[in-house]
Amino acid sequence: KWILVCIYPKAICEMIDIIGIDKMGIMEVKDMLVHCENALNVLIDTSRLHYIRPILRNIISFKSRLGNNDDNINDYEEMLEAIEKLFDKFGHERELFEWYPYYVDCEFCCVNELIAERRCMTGISIEELAGDTQSSRNVQRIIKGYVSPSYNTSKKLLDRLGLKGVLRSDVIVGSGVEAYETLDKALDCIAMSKFEDAERLISQLRTMFYSNVEINNIVLEYLEIWLQMLKDEVEFSEVVNRLESLLPFKYSEIGKYKYLVKHERMILSTYIECLGKMEKYEAIPDYDKMTSWITNELSKKQFASIFEDLNMRYANSYGNAGHYEKSDRIAEEGIRIEIECERMHCLNTLLYCRAWNAGERGNVSENDKELCRCAYEIAKLKKQNIRMGLYRRWLEKQ
């Protein structure tokens, strides 16, 4: 689907532009409508906005051509109107010509720096890290960045630092692509509060993991803790303590380390969420400290999934604490990056946060209502019924 989402929506729209809708026969219209609907489903499955405007326009045109003027076509028209207004507001005039690596949330770091930082984090000596397979002198040169280690050398050093499998991982290390798809589905089910489905998928994951890879076991335990928290089966204070035990450093050291792996950032995000639910806003680590490793505009896109998630959680927490201006600034930045990267993972939450802040201040503008309407349309597109209800109730109050 990642390959499809980069190519399929754009390719379909370009073909339609070349052929021309007016020149298509009824059978061609039906075929291309199916392609457009499939392309839209790929965007929904991957939470992307790449070419969503022309896709929606074509679906509306094809349905009108076929005489399908029902409620279904109105849904597409409302979605298109909301997206166009949002893109216009943030100056996103045209679709990205193509996706460069940083738009696909491709994050890289120098393995030398990761090894050096982890050595400091764990307190292991150079001699212990070298073991009986490397010379201490060579390891020291690697840590200082004088030489680049081979894959095998990197693997051995990272194994000793508790990061076995990290060179192959994207959160987890699975035995095949099915494991990564199952993890994505489990996370989606949790987001949509489909807890029984999430538990079933997490059980399936256990059979797809390499159990001797430590990060896999950490991710499984994290998912179980997170699920218990969302189901109100455990106190937030207990969740905070259990999450800290999964990290290789203390909460007090947040901001000290730059190169964290994905599951560690996921754990920290849930930690922030817990503190917010406990209303311990003063204990939440400073936003600038949490994002100190994001040094420029490009790195915001390179680490888009992490950056958008942090912005969502901090915007919500600061808003709940009554720091509306700070919340607005963070939410606005998150929305901008989501739109520039044509993503919609956290977009509806960030949009609603801006509108909610305005409501709490008692000065809701038409622009705030438009933001919430767009949040509603995105939630509707992604079939997030609970969030749809939340956004609808807010709009009805205004």
Write out the residue ranges for each language-model feature.
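DNA major-groove recognition helix of helix-turn-helix/homeodomain DNA-binding modules
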Residues: 150-169
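Short alpha-helical DNA-recognition segment
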Residues: 121-141
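Structural signature of alpha-solenoid helical repeat scaffolds
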Residues: 44-47, 68-71, 103, 173-174, ...
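A short, Lys/Arg-rich alpha-helix, primarily the initiator
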Residues: 92-122
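TPR-repeat structural position
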Residues: 22, 26-29, 69, 73, ...
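Amphipathic alpha-helical segments of tetratricopeptide repeats
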Residues: 1, 30-44, 80-88, 199-210, ...
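Amphipathic alpha-helical repeat scaffolds of TPR domains
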Residues: 2-19, 53-64, 176-185, 214-230, ...
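Structural motif corresponding to the intra-repeat A-B loop/turn of tetratricopeptide repeats
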Residues: 19-23, 66, 122, 192, ...
